[in-house]
């Protein structure tokens, strides 16, 4: 499945489909804790793919009838990444691509719920804009997450493939690097 957050859907209206290579498109999952997902979002297109919206029992939304609505708790104002992965696993999804923005990726990273992190560096200077990945502050550098990584050149861009699997725990709490 491919997963994204409501911010990315509202900002970019992604299709979340496979287009540049052959192969089937994955199921689409949107995290929408407050019921803000428009029924016209392209991620909800009725094209035979399974579509899920992860929300809360309190959230009011008007989703198409064939979209699976999964109500999850949000004890700290957000749905916990570990709860999201558990709910998806219960529904048969064991490989998840998080194609979200900085907020969604940051929350999964901080919770220790990522096996891999791909960071693309492009030779462009944007200046001011939305923040990138943000994590809780650390007191010392030895508390930082450090992951083995591979570097791939993609034309003018560089992809950093960071292996976080050694720092991922079953309960979703990241281990410190050693």
Regions found by a protein language model. Name each.
Residues 1-178:
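Enzymes that bind and transform nitrogen-containing heteroaromatic metabolites
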